[in-house]
Amino acid sequence: MQLIITTFPHPNIPRKLRIRVRHPKLSPIEFSIRCSSSTSSSMDAQNPPKRVVVCGGGVIGVCTAYFLSKGGAAVTLLEKSSIACAASGKAGGFLALDWCDGGAVSSLARASFNLHRSLAQELNGADLYGYRPVNALSLSITEPTSSSSSAKLNRIPDPNVPSWVDGPAKSPRTIGTTETTAQVHPHLFTKALVSKAVEEYGLKVVIGKLERVAVAEGAATVVVLEGGGEIEADAVVLALGPWTGKLSLLGSLFRVYGLKAHSIVLEPKEADAITPDALFLSYYPAQGGKPLDPEVYPRPTGEVYICGMSAEAEVPDDPEQVMPVPESIRVLKTVARNVSSHLVEGEATVKAEQACFLPCTDDSVPVIGEVPGVKGCYVATGHSCWGILNGPATGAAVSELVLDGSASIVDLTRFSPTRFLRGSK
């Protein structure tokens, strides 16, 4: 057995501290490192903190671990591969205050948008993970045919369209302002939370594969790892994203499927020309057919993130095995060059061609709450394309649920897994 315990320093420090320990008999928890003595030094031995194991190193699991550890719990974060290695590292990072209004996620989204703003102030998010308010525009683009490609040269600039968007864009409409829309770099955001929790709140990070949750007398007691390692727990949080269904404890209760989404990251030569305007496109291919709905997110890093081309697909066991479909990447590159001359080949470097799986439920509502019939075992998954937005409020709510017995930041009734029980309404 090889267990890798990783501690993450402050994001401004370029090197990670990675310690590899090999021992066939001892459990991973005995090798984990507490990087802050500030919490442990004041801990009352007669009133030990609640031991919580959070399974899943994506944004939902990390936000949950962050708020739990900040709230005084002794938290172990278990991740199979690496922090933010899946959708949380490859998402767009777009945040919206009111785009979920009128739906089941409205209160969660509003609370989380405001919590993102607070976290950015607390963690210096503008510098550490690219938090910033942005404008959002809806645009229509009809892909030019070869015979009409010269029309782009004669395009009259629209004052309502950012100057760098010099392709055949039409029908601009403002759908978000700096008061209602914002962005983060999701990978940097997730890593920043882990760093803060490790350094100041005693979070332990263990790299290992979850095999099962041991249940005794109707309560979760131990997290069992592949290879035989065990971590004792007073509570367990399962934030497994699209891998939720692979755990029999949850797969028998409800379905979470994976929507495979593709993205590319470009770095234009003239990055300063790109303004902080998120673009939501109705894109009509030259060959006809159903219009596409790609999204374009300029980042303060100087990069431009473009995503789209989503379809349900089988989720592989290993997140590192998720590979993009070449045709989907080709389409996104075509979209890029029709959006802006700054994004054509030769004017922009391709930094990433990637794919990830968004966790979706059959009723399009996240699953957040205690697992029916298993006291002390909680689930948080199924956030689809709004995982980065709703991560903070989900994490804060689950933390309250675990430590206090109920959540005050948002009413979790609508998200409870009990809705999947036969006869529930």
Residue ranges of predicted features:
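Conserved FAD-binding subdomain of flavin-dependent enzymes
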Residues: 67-70, 74, 80-136, 142-153
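Active-site substrate-recognition segment that forms the wall
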Residues: 66-67, 93-95, 127-133, 235, ...
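N-terminal Rossmann-like FAD-binding beta1-loop-alpha1 element of flavoenzymes
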Residues: 47-76
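N-terminal chloroplast transit peptides
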Residues: 1-27
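Predominantly flavin-linked oxidoreductase catalytic cores and closely associated redox partners
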Residues: 184-274
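Flavin (FAD/FMN) cofactor-binding and adjacent substrate-gating region
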Residues: 122-208, 212-219, 224
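Flavin (FAD/FMN) cofactor-binding core of flavoprotein oxidoreductases
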Residues: 138-143, 259, 326-408, 412-425
